[in-house]
């Protein structure tokens, strides 16, 4: 992996054997090895239900449905995380590009990337997140 060196210690320490048992092969590859699921194949790409999207590894709430939008990119897209504490950003120099990788700030799981082509009337950001890195918890609209 040609991501910048990660010396950060995350609060939630993952046991690899336990993760391999608990996660699907795709969830494991995405969250632990920064793989990317194929566009338009993820479980949450078109989900419009009200609720919270949580880290599949540690269950930290990451995004709310109100921040989700249809970007047409093939992955769930959000214009902001739940708050400024839940996301960790790292420079990613893979595939001949320089991008900003997005990780769960509690466990370090790879989630996806953030780009500056989101809705201009919101934050201008597009958090492009792999469905395999998320679990969805449905909630009524008024909660």
Swiss-Prot record:
It holds the Pfam family SelR. Binds 1 zinc ion per subunit. The zinc ion is important for the structural integrity of the protein. The keyword Metal-binding applies. The active site is at 128 (nucleophile). GO terms for molecular function: peptide-methionine (R)-S-oxide reductase activity; zinc ion binding. Its EC number is 1.8.4.12. Gene3D superfamilies: Peptide methionine sulfoxide reductase (2.170.150.20). Zn(2+) binds at residues 55, 58, 104, 107. One of its GO terms (biological process) is protein repair. It comes from the Bacteria. InterPro entries: Met_Sox_Rdtase_MsrB, Met_Sox_Rdtase_MsrB_dom, Mss4-like_sf. PANTHER family: METHIONINE SULFOXIDE REDUCTASE, METHIONINE-R-SULFOXIDE REDUCTASE B1. This is Peptide methionine sulfoxide reductase MsrB. The lineage of its organism: Bacteria, Pseudomonadati, Pseudomonadota, Betaproteobacteria, Burkholderiales.
């Amino acid at each position: 992996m040609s991501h910048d060196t990660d010396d950060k210690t995350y609060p939630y320490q993952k046991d690899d054997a336990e993760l391999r048992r608990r996660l699907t092969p795709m969830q494991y590859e995405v969250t632990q090895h920064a793989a990317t699921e194929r566009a338009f194949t993820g479980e949450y790409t078109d989900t419009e239900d009200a609720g919270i999207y949580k880290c599949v590894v540690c269950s930290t709430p990451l995004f709310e449905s109100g921040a989700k939008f249809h970007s047409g990119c093939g992955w769930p897209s959000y214009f902001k995380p739940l708050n400024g504490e839940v996301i960790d950003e790292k420079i990613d120099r893979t595939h001949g590009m320089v991008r900003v990788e997005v990780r769960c700030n509690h466990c370090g799981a790879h989630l996806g990337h953030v780009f500056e082509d989101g809705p201009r009337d919101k934050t201008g950001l597009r958090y492009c997140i792999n469905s395999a890195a998320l679990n969805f918890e449905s909630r009524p609209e008024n909660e």
